């Protein structure tokens, strides 16, 4: 008499969309939007393409969800840093220092996900990143305009240029100390132009 051992099938691995978005954020941040394929994403998530498209609609659909997650978890907290009870220049310097710290925090994903995404070749993805970037610029512009309306556009452009430069230098491997030195130089300019 032979005994048959019936093996019950294992429970299928559960797909967690929020975990997938976190994984995708790291992939997009470390490699850039253009360099990450749907095949890379499905492999990282452990799912097949139909499941990917059912969950996210498209690579762009996933990317927009990544940008929303980034805004909530990893973006520079402009609302907390741009305080009305402190000197304008000091708050802007704090934004730059926080940018420098965040841009080098993960050696595998340096720079700013949004600023780097604003340079991708895919037009809809680039527009999604730019929309996020423009919203951040508008917060800075509004903040500066409260005390320095005549300087708001110029200071917003200056901050955007500095943040893009910090992101590029972080991606090029510059240390936090080097980025902070640049922020200190920029801080001298900000304090001179915005003395409150």
Model-derived segments and their meaning:
Residues 1-15, 194-196:
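N-terminal intrinsically disordered/low-complexity leader segments
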Residues 19, 23-61, 65:
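Helix-turn-helix
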Residues 26, 30, 58, 84, ...:
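Conserved amphipathic alpha-helical interaction elements at protein-protein interfaces in regulatory
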Residues 65, 78-110, 156-159:
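Hydrophobic alpha-helical connector segments
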Residues 68-74:
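Short, basic, alpha-helical segments at the C-terminal edge of helix-turn-helix-like DNA-binding modules
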Residues 75, 90, 94-97, 123-147, ...:
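Amphipathic alpha-helical packing segments from all-alpha helical-bundle domains
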Residues 91, 104-127:
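Amphipathic alpha-helical segments used for helix-helix packing
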Residues 110, 116-119, 151-172, 181-189:
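Hydrophobic alpha-helical segments that form the core
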């Amino acid at each position: 008499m032979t005994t048959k051992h019936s093996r019950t099938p294992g429970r299928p691995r559960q797909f967690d969309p929020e975990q997938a978005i976190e994984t995708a954020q790291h992939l997009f941040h470390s490699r850039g939007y253009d360099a990450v394929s749907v095949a890379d994403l499905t492999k990282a998530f452990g799912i097949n393409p139909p499941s990917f498209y059912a969950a996210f609609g498209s690579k762009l659909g996933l990317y927009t969800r990544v940008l929303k997650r980034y805004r909530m978890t990893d973006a520079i907290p402009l609302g907390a840093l741009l305080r009305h009870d402190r000197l304008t220049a000091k708050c802007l310097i704090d934004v730059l220092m926080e940018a420098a710290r965040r841009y080098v925090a993960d050696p595998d994903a340096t720079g700013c996900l949004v600023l780097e995404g604003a340079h991708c070749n895919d037009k809809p993805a680039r527009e999604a990143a730019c929309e996020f970037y423009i919203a951040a610029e508008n917060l800075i512009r509004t903040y500066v305009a409260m005390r320095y309306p005549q300087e708001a556009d110029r200071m917003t452009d200056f901050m955007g240029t500095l943040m893009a430069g910090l992101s590029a230098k972080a991606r090029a491997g510059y240390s936090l100390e080097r980025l902070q030195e640049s922020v200190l130089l920029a801080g001298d300019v900000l304090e001179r132009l915005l003395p409150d």
